[in-house]
Structures are given as C-alpha cells and as structure tokens.
Amino acid sequence: MKTDNMIETKRHFPILLALALTLGVFAAGSEELVISPLLPDLAQTFHSSIDVLALSISMYGIMILVGAPLLVPIGDKYSRELCLMIGLSLFIIGTVICAAAQDLYTFFLGRALSGLAAGAFVPTAYAVVGDRVPYQYRGKVMGLIVSSWSLALIFGVPLGAFIGGSLNWRWTFWIFAFIGLLVLALVLYEARGSASGKAGQENGEQPAGTFLQALRVPRVPVYITITFCNMTGFYGMYSYLGTYLQQVFSGGNTVAGLFIMIYGIGFSMSVFSGKAADRFGKMRSLVIAMAVLSILLACLPYAPKSLPLLCIGLLIWGVMQSLTVTLLSTILSDCSHHHRGKIMAFYSLASNLAVTLGSAVMGPVYIRYGYSFVGLICAAITLCGFVLSVYGYKQYSTHDQHMEETLHQ
C-alpha cells in the first residue's frame, strides 16, 4: 500500500528528467531577466520609450502569479506531464510571438503568454521532483533546478544580451523557443514511461481538492510562511546590494557586478549543498541555514571594511540562500502527493509576493536610514523564519526520520 508521499518513483538517478526540468527553468528564468539589457534595442524597434517597454517585465511577473493558480491544478487533477506540456507549449508560442512581433501590442501578448507559461511550468517542475524522483535524490535534483536560476542570471542573460547585440534581439527569443522545443521533446519522452501519469487517480484517491484543503495539509502553512520570510529578507537585502557596493567602492557597475557574481557562484553550488542535505536531514539542514542567514544579513553591511571578509560573506550568502530555497521547495513538494501542485503554487505565490514587498518596502528604508538598517530589518524577518524552522523541526522531524528509515530498508 503506497502512502500519500511515497508514490512509485524511478530507483535510479533520473538524468533526462532532471535535464528537462533544469533546462525548462533556465529558459523561463533567462527570458524573464533578459529583457533588461535588450530594452534599448526593443524601444528602437517598436518606436517607443524604454519605460513603456519595461512594462513587459511587470507583465511577465503578473502573468506568473496568474498562471500558477490557473494552470497548476491541472497537474493535481489529471497529470503533471500534461501541465508541463501545456506550460511549454504556451512558452514556445509566446516566445515565437515575441521573436516575430512587428508591433508593441503583439510583443506584449507574447510576453504575457510566456509569463503564464512560467507560472504553470515552474511550480509543476517542483511538484514533479516529489512525484518522480526517489527520496535520496530529491535534494540533488531540486538543487539542480534551483541552481538553474543562478545560471540564468550568470550565463543566460549575458548570452542573450550578446546574441541580441551581435545579431538581433529577435534571435535571442528564437533561441529560447528552440530550448523550449528541446525541453518539450524530453518531457514527451519521459511521459511515455511514466508510472505516475495521473496524479493520485491510480491509487484510488478522490479528485484533487481545493486550494484551501492544500493549505490545511500539515507542515504547509509553516513552511510557506518560512518561504515568505526567507524571500522577503533576501530580496530586501539583494535589491540594494549593487547600489550600496557602488557607494562603497569606486568602479561603478563593473565592480559591483563582480562582487554580485561571487554571490552567484555560491548560489550555483546548490546541487552539492542539496546532496549534503539529503544525507544530513532536510529539516535539520534548514534550521542551520536559516540561522546562518539571520546572522549574515545583519553583519553583511559592515563586511566591505575588509575585502576578503566581503567575498567570503557573499559566497556563504549564496550557498546558504540556494540551500534554503532547495530545502523549502523539497520539503513542501513532499508534504502531499494529492495536493502537491497546489502546494507548489502557494510556494510560487509566496516567493513572488516576497519579491515585490521586499524590494518595495526596503527602498524607503535604504534611502532614509542606510544599508545597515536594511540589513537589521531583513535579518529580523529571516530570524522569524528561523524560529518557525525550529518549530517545524521539533513538530515534524519524525517525517525526515521515517523517510530515512524507509530509504535504508
């Protein structure tokens, strides 16, 4: 008899599945972020201003929030693969529309479809890890997916900007559309041998429940709140890091970019830290990561007084933040197979809401009181998440122990 969290999975490391999900998130993240360096060329092509074209970034983010609750439940009711295919199809169509757009309204339509697709694909990708990846590999695979966000920032955006500058901005979107086609082919191939085609239907479960029922699943409210605390603290701090570093060091954007790249290198190590967390225990690792982040955010504004200390601090911040994101997404995806898609939609919603609030609320604080005060507030918010992680570990740590015992058996 299979339990709620232990549907049949592949016993070996799912290379193709991990590649498909990682590439898909990489493409979604790259397309979301690549607009920024392409804005001047887009404004020239469509005979508009940069601030108007910048609305396409906001539109993408809004449609992500719409896509998650609108399309992710398809994975709970029918199958994850179907939801992935719908998301990828919308992504390809939207990206092709952007590449071929002859006017501003058509370009905005393409961006809206691409954002809707990302809202469906990303939470479903997290849910698929819980469905299809053996417990001993989940942290590693989730680490790969999480690191793809960092790879999108470090490689995807500069590559897209280089292609746009060397050839034409349209080629950037054509290449992302090709990546989408490649991911769709991998998902179709994986779906052929999937034993988990219908989410819960084969085990005689009732049809997928409501979002309210998903929110009532044990552990979910606690770890969604931790996600919000972590992401609010992170984005509140990260949004003004570059500006602060430019004030402290001479060299402008170049020097600030190099320091931020150190953070990106640390963030990209999530595949290794996730693998270590698989062995050490996910909830226990989360408590440690949140504790380190709480201290680090409070101290980071003072780190520029020592260059080696700043580099080490940024590297540790990247490692701990990527580990936290990996652990939270893994823990939440493992809360319930029956409601997994909706739970990950809540995870996506909490993350995106934190992005908006963190940067918006900390802006006036930074201008009036400085970066050190921003660090204290973000550390306090993260500390709230740490307290909740301790509570979650004491309340639900038997789940980790149960899964480890099952794995050994």
Predicted features and spans:
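Helix-to-loop junctions at the C-terminal end of transmembrane segments
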Residues: 68-79, 270-281, 366-367
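Helix-loop-helix hairpin linking two adjacent transmembrane segments in secondary transporters
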Residues: 106, 135-137, 143-191
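Conserved MFS/SLC helix-loop-helix module at the cytosolic interface between two early adjacent transmembrane helices
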Residues: 66-104
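C-terminal transmembrane helical hairpin of 12-TM major facilitator-type secondary transporters
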Residues: 283-328
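A late C-terminal transmembrane helix in Major Facilitator Superfamily
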Residues: 335-371, 378
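Cytoplasmic helix-loop-helix junction between adjacent transmembrane helices
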Residues: 110-151
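Paired small-residue
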Residues: 90, 94-97, 105-114, 308-316
